[in-house]
Regions:
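Extended amphipathic alpha-helical elements
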Residues: 1-557, 565
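Alpha-helical lid/collar subdomain of P-loop NTPases
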Residues: 420, 427-431, 435-438, 446-447, ...
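Dynamic helix-loop-helix/coil hinge segments at AAA+ ATPase domain boundaries and subdomain interfaces
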Residues: 559-575, 622, 839-855
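Phosphate-binding P-loop
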Residues: 573-574, 582-588, 853-855, 862-869, ...
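Walker A/P-loop
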Residues: 586-618, 635-636, 871-902
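Loop/turn-to-beta-strand initiation segments
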Residues: 588-590, 615, 640-644, 688-694, ...
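Conserved alpha-helical scaffold flanking the Walker A/P-loop in AAA+ ATPase domains
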Residues: 625-646, 679-686, 863
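Conserved catalytic/switch belt of AAA+ P-loop NTPases
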Residues: 635, 650-687, 692, 698-701, ...
């Protein structure tokens, strides 16, 4: 009793619940320790009850002493205990006895509920305080739009994450039964955060749409002229967007800015108006695209720039390569103007290799830009056809090499060939087919058969190939060298075909070995030819046209300008791809090459397009591509008659693939029905039946989708395997001027096969097709610099000097051992550039590096690699001198006069 009595005198503010708890338990123990004989005594019973009640009360007192107790909770306690008392928030001198007198142990469950509610409410209260503190400090991040003072707003990534987390927290608080006291405040925060989220989304969409449309509507006179109402509408939107963005930025605080009165409704209205402008612009551009379908493959910004500057053709020239794939620019007549004060286009410049081709006749750039760009395209095709008709005649009148190197008359007799490279290849292909078929006619001649005609044809082709190889060893300009190298590639393939037919004893042109080859012909088309009435202006006087026959497919040559670039080395695998692909096109289907990476799926498709002179666009598919973009591509392909090669098509998401089935089926059905117009995505467009679609796939790779069955049925599959590297090496060596190409190709392939198997597995090692091509280019350079040196030595030097920079030290012994085995007794010295090495030495001294021989060699090797590579990795352990290596080379180049900057 003394303990309880003394406890009652303790001030509530100074009460220590732990001490009380320990003291009360000691009292209980002391009472229990009394002798059993006193337990029947009334005093014992009273003391025992008092101590137990006190023990049961102490935990409740601890709960009531918590900081979470507010006046509302003390008032609730008064109601539960039905006793009136002055709570501690009113009476700072309240004693513990005042609380003990409430007999809390009799209401323990109610007291615990009150205290639990107080604790939960405190948690909500603290969360609200944290929300206020956090959102009072969150401000906008800003980038200025182009060179203006218009702010483009965004939130920091961590602030956006806080927004999402806080929205979930507020939802959780509203779901709590303890939120009643804070209901209005929490609901207000829910509204605030929802506004922040909505406004943030609107700001992102508005900024994206506005910044896309602003240069088009404000900066494009064409849009203002063609869409006056929408241009006026956008002017108002432009003012509103800038005002709202500047206001939000001036407020700084995200919460305050996003919760301005009426802001959300104003943003909704702005977004609606922007969508109207965007739709009008899209409809306008689609109208222009329908007039000149190649505009489907240009971005809207580029297209509007073209349309805006259409009356000034000089300003449109920078977009030439986006409209005509292999054309860099047009040459305009600076002296004479048309009746509309426009220039004439007199020639075009190749974007692939080096070549200029003069229009026949020159083209007046009159009218709307979409009209005269179509006229330019037609004029290109007509010019190529005119060149073909002359080239076919000239081929019969000159020796082959004279015809090949024949130049135009003044003013550029030394630069421009009389025929574009594309026409030279076409003429060669036409005459090769004619010569082989003439050999077959000689074999089967009824009165005077010549069974050796095909062998004689082979001998003639071998000599022609040797002549071309010898021609590469003479001094040629870049344009002529490229042309001759491509001719060698084509001639080598032609020779291999005739060798195969001789080996198989082929005696007739109807044999499959011959029918399965791409055969270029210049003749009057037979009745079973495809598109027999197409392009009557591209016919000879007797109705002849250039066409390609393979098996039962006969298609016209399309005269798309290809430039003066390299062509693919054709292997037996390529021939099989050509047969399947052309059969698919003949059946009005698409084609689907599938196989591992690096096997030539895309390149074979592009080369087939080159053989047929078709415009071929390559699209890299990704999961981000949507059905609208894909629909525009199909519209462009269908109406322009172009080919589309969709790389890694199975990376598209299943939803897009499903829509693609409908889109491409509309094209296929239109081609089969010989329709002049088709409907894709509710748009009616013209249909050119020579269009084609190719999809390449890497089966079994991660992240790939399964094609819908309906889509599979529209494409003919082709399985593509690893190409014949030996044959590719042989052809490329011949093109570089090597006469012992067959032997050297076998050694080359053997070396790379052994290196792949025997050297350590390093991430930077590459013994594939790309590495092969790079070494052959180096070997060709050595051959031209030292034509009298043994060819084995030249190739060995290229293999050694190109590969040794990337070989790690532990592999060097194996590498040199294999080189020695394949090229015994051959060890040509490294090609030295004394001038470069002197500049490297001076650069080392200027940078404070010790110019030892090994370091200087690495710098020189880096320079040699950069001559044939766009990018080089400099690898090695820390402190090996990687940075100093490239810095020294940059300094050496600057000393040499080639100013080199680095960042």
């Amino acid at each position: 009793q003394r303990f309880v009595h003394s406890s009652k005198e303790i001030l509530w503010s100074e009460m220590d619940s732990n001490e009380l708890d320990e003291g009360s338990k000691n009292q209980v123990k002391a009472i229990k320790a009394l002798h059993k004989c006193v337990r029947w005594c009334p005093a014992y019973k009273a003391a025992d009850k008092l101590s137990k009640d006190f023990v049961n009360t102490i935990p409740l007192i601890s709960l009531l002493a918590a900081k979470c107790m507010r006046d509302r909770h003390w008032n609730a306690l008064k109601i539960v205990t039905k006793k009136d008392f002055t709570p501690p928030y009113e009476d700072k001198n309240m004693l513990l006895g005042n609380i003990l007198s409430l007999n809390l142990h009799e209401f323990s469950a109610d007291v615990e509920d009150i205290c639990d509610q107080a604790a939960k409410e405190l948690k909500i209260e603290n969360t609200i305080i944290q929300l206020k503190e956090r959102w009072s400090g969150i401000e906008w991040l800003m980038e200025t739009y182009k060179d203006t003072d218009v702010p483009l707003l965004k939130m920091a990534e961590e602030d956006f994450e806080s927004l999402e987390a806080d929205q979930l927290t507020v939802q959780g608080m509203l779901a709590s039964r303890f939120v009643k006291q804070f209901q209005e405040e929490v609901q207000e925060w829910q509204k605030h955060l929802a506004n922040v989220a909505d406004v943030f989304v609107f700001i992102g969409e508005i900024q994206r749409t506005w910044s896309y449309l602003e240069p088009l509507f404000i900066g494009s006179e064409e849009v203002k002229r063609e869409l006056p109402e929408d241009a006026k509408r956008f002017e108002g939107i432009d003012v509103n967007v800038k005002h709202e963005l500047k206001t939000c930025w001036e407020i700084k605080n995200v919460d305050q800015a996003c919760n301005q009165d009426g802001l959300l409704s104003r943003f909704e209205n702005i977004q609606e108006q922007l969508e109207i402008c965007k739709k009008s612009l899209s409809d306008f551009l689609d109208g222009r695209r329908r007039q000149f379908p190649r505009y489907y493959f240009t971005s809207e910004a580029d297209l509007l720039d073209i349309l805006s500057n259409g009356s000034t053709p000089e300003k449109v020239l920078k977009h030439t390569a986006k409209v005509y794939l292999s054309c860099k620019t047009l040459v305009l007549d600076k002296n004479e103007r048309t009746s509309e004060d426009r220039p004439y286009a007199t020639a075009w410049v190749s974007g692939v290799g080096v070549e200029n081709v003069a229009f026949e006749p020159r083209v007046p750039l009159n009218g709307k830009v979409e009209i005269y760009q179509q006229v330019v395209l037609d004029a290109m095709k007509q010019t190529l056809f005119n060149n073909l008709t002359r080239s076919v005649v000239r081929y019969q009148q000159m020796s082959r090499n004279e015809w090949l190197m024949h130049k135009k008359p003044e003013p550029n007799p030394k630069e421009d060939s009389s025929d574009p490279a594309q026409i030279i290849l076409l003429t060669l292909a036409i005459n090769y087919v004619e010569e082989v078929e003439q050999a077959f006619r000689s074999i089967t001649h009824p009165s005077n058969p010549n069974p050796n005609a095909l062998k004689l044809q082979l001998d003639r082709q071998v000599e022609q190939l040797k002549d071309l190889i010898r021609l590469t060893q003479t001094k040629l300009n870049k344009s002529d060298r490229t042309r001759v190298m491509v001719c060698i590639t084509m001639d080598a393939h032609s020779r291999d075909i005739v060798i195969g037919m001789n080996r198989d004893g082929v005696q007739d042109a109807s044999a499959f070995q011959w029918q399965s080859q791409l055969k270029h012909k210049y003749r009057k088309p037979p009745p079973n030819a495809s598109f027999i009435n197409r392009d009557p202006q591209l016919r000879g006087d007797a109705g002849q046209r250039a066409e390609i026959a393979i098996c039962d497919a006969i298609v016209p040559y399309d005269y798309e300008y290809l430039g003066n670039g390299p062509r693919l080395v054709i292997t037996p695998l390529t021939d099989r791809i050509y047969v399947t692909a052309t059969q698919a096109l003949n059946l009005k289907m698409g084609c689907a090459p599938a196989g591992p990476a690096g096997t030539g799926k895309t390149e074979s498709t592009k080369d087939l397009a080159s053989a047929l002179a078709k415009c071929c666009y390559v699209f890299n598919c990704s999961p981000e591509m949507d059905y609208l973009g894909l629909g525009n591509i199909f519209k462009g392909l269908a109406s322009s008659g172009s080919w589309g090669c969709f790389d890694e098509f199975n990376r598209l998401v299943p939803e897009v693939l499903s829509v693609c089935t409908v889109q491409f089926k509309a094209v296929c059905d239109g081609v089969k029905a010989e329709s002049a117009r088709i409907v894709i995505e509710s748009d009616e467009i013209s249909l050119d039946p020579t269009c084609g679609a190719f999809i390449t796939m890497n089966p079994g790779y991660l992240g790939r989708s399964e094609l819908p069955e309906g889509l599979k049925a529209l494409f003919r599959p082709i399985t593509v395997m690893v190409p014949d590297l030996v044959l590719i090496c042989e052809n490329m060596l011949m093109a570089e001027g090597f006469t012992q190409a067959k032997v050297l190709a076998s050694k080359f392939y053997g070396l790379y096969s052994l290196l792949r198997d025997l050297l350590s597995k390093q991430l930077h090692y590459d013994w594939g097709l790309r590495a092969v091509k790079s070494v052959l280019v180096v070997a060709g350079g050595f051959k031209r610099m030292e034509p009298d040196l043994q060819e084995e030595a030249l190739l060995m030097r290229a293999l050694r000097d190109f590969n040794i920079p990337k070989i790690v030290r532990e592999d060097e012994v194996v590498f040199f051992g294999l080189l020695g085995d394949l090229f015994p007794g051959i060890d040509p010295p490294r090609k030295i550039n004394p001038q470069l090495e002197e500049y490297v030495r001076l650069a080392c001294e200027q940078l404070g590096n010790h110019p030892d021989e090994v370091f200087r060699l690495k710098v020189v090797q880096l320079e040699e690699l950069l001559e044939i590579r766009h990018c080089v990795f400099v690898m090695g352990p820390p402190g090996a001198g990687k940075t100093q290596c490239w810095k020294t080379l940059a300094e050496a180049r600057s000393l040499k006069g080639d100013k080199t900057k680095y960042v």
